Amino acid sequence: GLKRPQGMSEMRDAGKRWVNFPEIQAACGVKIVAPKLENAIAGTTLHLANTSEQKAEAEQSIREEWRGIYDKMPIMCSVCKKVSPRVEFITNCQNGTCKGAIEEKDGVVIKADTVGGLEALAFELFKLKIPVRQATVGPVNKKDILMAKSIQDPLNQAILGFSTKPNTEVADELSSDESEIAFFSGSIIYHIIDAFEEWRTAKQEE
């Protein structure tokens, strides 16, 4: 089924206020109800495949889409310590002035409910020259916490979530005052970034 929010309701706040549609136009918010969508990722391109060839083309397109997102993530060069999008790091550092450079295994963990949200959060972090160690769509889970704990720089031992929350397995751990990992989440990116920067400043003054 194809559903859109009723009236002026927002996608995230529609609750049970949804209206069925026989068809939809491009570039509109839509909720798709169908079987076997457990691994679908919100915000990605919707492909229609009626043949095996079309399916193969769609799969290749999806891989390229994810590759584009991967290349945009800000990372730190092991030699010059400059933070830049991964594709620029390869061009300017690995193949340029910093021969033998590798990607520093440092940076924050970011989460979002859609691919677009992930890109937006990564872009704001890049402007602050903060590297991203891992970026994935969906609720915060145990693997995300383990990744954040493995970061050596204490100023980057944090998880930033845009419009996403921890799953039930890790919710209590992240909300605890004794949590080893700082967790910042919300539906407004600038509020998340501001809270994160305040935490880093306080951390530096300890």
Predicted regions span which residues?
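C-terminal effector/interaction modules appended to NTPase cores
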Residues: 1-206
